[in-house]
């Protein structure tokens, strides 16, 4: 964690989320670079299961910013967010003639890096929505 107070780097990570990394990346790409206030609204109306895990992680990162640096949630934007593949949960499915077939259930690790907003980023992201 960056301890300088000029523009602190706030991190939060969630590991071993039971979701395919490919499916999680399609949600993460929608909120990368957005202000913190916009991201939960976007996630709330997306129909994907991973949105709940990402919104919990966002609120955790905002709580870290408030507790560790005393920053307000309105001053934050998502600087970087990445999804990495985790290990597979390996299960067995029984097949014909006494055989077994492997089932691989993927997991992923999500890391969010937030920074303090300098003001210009909010104006750009509001223009995207036509406001």
Swiss-Prot record:
GO terms for molecular function: rRNA binding; structural constituent of ribosome. It is found in: Plastid. Keywords: Plastid, Ribonucleoprotein, Ribosomal protein, RNA-binding, rRNA-binding. It holds the Pfam family Ribosomal_L22. The keyword RNA-binding applies. GO terms for biological process: translation. One of its GO terms (cellular component) is large ribosomal subunit. Part of the 50S ribosomal subunit. Belongs to the universal ribosomal protein uL22 family. This protein binds specifically to 23S rRNA. This is Large ribosomal subunit protein uL22c. It comes from Aneura mirabilis. The gene is rpl22.
